[in-house]
Amino acid sequence: CPTPDAPQYACCLHGMPTFRESNPNPATRAVSTPNKLFDFKSLGYNYDNLDFHGMDTAHLEAAIKKQKQKDRVFAGFLLHGIKTSADVHLKVCNAADCHEAGVVFVLGARTEMPWHFDRNYKMDITDVLHEMHIPMEALFENDSKIHLEVEIQSVDGAILDSHSLPTPSLIYAPAKGLVSQHIEDHDTETLIRKNVNSLSPSEIKNLRDALVAVQADKSGNGYQKIASYHGMPLSCHYPNGTAFACCQHGMVTFPHWHRLYMKQMEDAMKAKGAKIGIPYWDWTTTFSHLPFLVTEPKNNPFHHGYIDVADTKTTRNPRPQLFDDPEQGDQSFFYRQIAFALEQRDFCDFEIQFEMGHNAIHSWVGGSSPYGMSTLHYTSYDPLFYLHHSNTDRIWAIWQALQKYRGLPYNSANCEINKLKKPMMPFSSDDNPNEVTKAHSTGTKHLNKIQEKDRVFAGFLLRAIGQSADVNFDICRKDGECKFGGTFCVLGGQHEMAWAFDRLFLYDISRTLLQLRLDAHDDFDVKVTIMGIDGKSLPTTLLPPPTILFKPGTGTQLTR
């Protein structure tokens, strides 16, 4: 699949190769191109509901619209692959006074496919600017000293070059008005994915029995083969023969590839007797422990997986911030991340916010474990991966329902169109026994309160850094007082495909600015640190310095 511009990266640029070649599942092989995957119901599954924190589609859209009725500032990041996973620590700076504004986690590995976003990933830094007493007007002054700085740290703790990613920019988003919409009902399908915490004892037993059988299956529909699609052993190859991980992340086809991947595993379990779909773990709600389905140690195939290629078991080493909100907000860290993603009205803008929100679960569940969720190469061997991605896919389905309610496109994308029409490996492979996935292997109250306020975001431009890492950042006043601004996770590995977002990942630093008695008019700094999953600091140059973006609230008047 060579191209004139990047022959060595043909698999990434032209589809999802892992699901096309040597795929024993004809269902996933038949639908292995992204543009066939917008309609998840065509794959034969549905969710028990698409509510978000008790809000149906109509109420969720109303809450989002209210949130957008204020001016906001974002840090805009143009992200791309940096060959490793890393944390990008953002700082908002007013001259030399820098304050932590948040952290972005980039998922990647040395052998990843090249990727980049074609628009900004946005991080809300409105609150950080407020806390730093920086007026919005200051953002537009010719001699403004307001800027963003980042420190990039890989998962092994090494500090990466801060110029590994473009310097984030400040983005101003004015308040939006309200538009009346209608609700459209949807039919349900027989195969239902349920909340993991609502499963009955008989459903738990049924799922465990099915997974035991899949794990014992050594064929192309078995656990080891399907798990290998995501990372090790490497299944995709450049034209020169170099192998790389087939997982697509940091690119527009991330949701499509993983939707098909979930279908592949779900069909394997269904073939072994599963009566319901893979349950979803709704990590946007506050939780203090992992789901019981995966923590019960006895006679439980969901407790861990075995990795034949490494001759070891998967392990988990949860970080404290998984259960204790690092930002100490009113709602959970994950709720805030996904709520902002759902605000987006364009698929390409939604995708980056959505993907980065999902990354933190990988990093904070796996922690420093070399064979766990935080590693791109082995994450898919942990059964918890599939509960996590069932919820990730459900969030995409929620956004699609919102788009239909808004009267906006919900099953198409206008960025990187070429990728949406190319087969995704290994689903499109002639060896894929799953005809469904083969056919779809191409692709064309708290919330209201938040939305009433001005917001400031730190924007990070993310790309592959070759490993997984946590990105943390502080917001600092010019007098030296600093407070934690935020954290996010970069998922990656040595063999990941090259990737880079072409837009900024946005992180809300409004609350931190308020804590520091600052606003958008004040001078402040953003100090970023990046730490790998092994605890080693990474150079901040792995990622460009973040930019600050302001989103004014309802009625905010801004003169330039």
Curated annotation (Swiss-Prot):
Superkingdom of this protein's organism: Eukaryota
Record has Cell cycle as a keyword: no
Record: glycosylation sites: N142, N240
Cross-linked sites for 2'-(S-cysteinyl)-histidine (Cys-His): C12-H14, C247-H249
SUPFAM superfamilies: C-terminal domain of mollusc hemocyanin, Di-copper centre-containing domain
Residues annotated for Cu cation B binding in this entry: H358, H362, H389
Annotated Cu cation A binding sites: H230, H249, H258
Cofactor(s) this protein cannot do without: Cu(2+)
Region (Unit H): 185-560
InterPro entries: Di-copper_centre_dom_sf, Haemocyanin_beta-sandwich, Haemocyanin_C_sf, Tyrosinase/Hemocyanin, Tyrosinase_Cu-bd
Region: Unit G, residue numbers: 1-184
Disulphide-bonded residues: C1-C11, C93-C98, C236-C246, C348-C415, C476-C482
MF terms in GO: metal ion binding; oxidoreductase activity; oxygen carrier activity
Assembly: Decamers of large identical subunits (390 kDa), each containing 8 globular oxygen-binding functional units.
Known role: Hemocyanins are copper-containing oxygen carriers occurring freely dissolved in the hemolymph of many mollusks and arthropods.
Protein name in the entry: Hemocyanin, units G and H
